[in-house]
């Protein structure tokens, strides 16, 4: 008799991601994966030959299910499995809970396992600040242990929430594409559960008798995502019927495909709108489709030093009006002390 369907689903999702990681490790640079010859990745003397994959685990149902699936699948594929839990220090006793998570991960057979404490700032609000601190800690842990990848437990439900949050902000198609299955420097972060619903992950924990911790912040109406999860999505499903989460997740993937195509188009078009000095020619920018032109403008602002997290669509729209609605207006101030101005038919974006 095979495993429970929920357990089978989470294991299959992790197995596929581990196969992807191994394929990439065994593929020489510049050689298509389909034609690569199996080989052992070159590693520094003294390091274990088996690649290490870490799981980021809060102790909640999603990440505990992910940890259990990694613990099961990794040794079958010759992969070492480890875990990291991040103590944000935002709740009383969070250090003790982090220690409990470490014990649970070790009981699953993961090694190495560690808890790392972070200080959460205030930039961008509590949710964004906690996320930034968490990823910084995970980056450091991955570098410290030489991990090939870090698995994150985001589910299809999380993806649906992310799409709705982007929609509410009036964001572009990139925000509507939600979370990528592969992200971070060198594809460090992997999200195996983006096609797995939250209920399946919780069921997998239950049938495996895995203890889980329900973060009270996830039910706190002070947090936007919590309100969306407990009020917004249920209201949508009541009004529109079941299948809203699946539809939003599908929208994310379709949007990502479109956004990737537009990004590629913009990169290819950028060379054609720059003059001999590297400046942007307004007439050539004007001739491009708006979606392509604005991507070029955003890239130019980022290259000039504007922080991506503070550079919003309204900023790019203001810069775009220097091209499409030119009336002799003055310079546009962007985040990061970056200034955009039109000079003699050229658009100049640089530090003020």
From Swiss-Prot:
It is found in: Cytoplasm. CDD domains: TilS_N (cd01992). The keyword RNA-binding does not apply. Its EC number is 6.3.4.19. Belongs to the tRNA(Ile)-lysidine synthase family. GO terms for cellular component: cytoplasm. Pfam families: ATP_bind_3 (PF01171), TilS (PF09179). InterPro entries: Rossmann-like_a/b/a_fold (IPR014729), TilS/TtcA_N (IPR011063), tRNA_Ile_lys_synt (IPR012094), tRNA_Ile_lys_synt_N (IPR012795), tRNA_Ile_lys_synt_subst-bd (IPR015262). ATP binds at residues 58-63. It catalyses: cytidine(34) in tRNA(Ile2) + L-lysine + ATP = lysidine(34) in tRNA(Ile2) + AMP + diphosphate + H(+). One of its GO terms (biological process) is tRNA modification. This is tRNA(Ile)-lysidine synthase. Ligates lysine onto the cytidine present at position 34 of the AUA codon-specific tRNA(Ile) that contains the anticodon CAU, in an ATP-dependent manner. Cytidine is converted to lysidine, thus changing the amino acid specificity of the tRNA from methionine to isoleucine. GO terms for molecular function: ATP binding; tRNA(Ile)-lysidine synthase activity. The N-terminal region contains the highly conserved SGGXDS motif, predicted to be a P-loop motif involved in ATP binding. It comes from Streptomyces coelicolor (strain ATCC BAA-471 / A3(2) / M145). Transmembrane segments: none annotated. Keywords: ATP-binding, Cytoplasm, Ligase, Nucleotide-binding, tRNA processing. PANTHER family: TRNA(ILE)-LYSIDINE SYNTHASE-RELATED (PTHR43033:SF1).
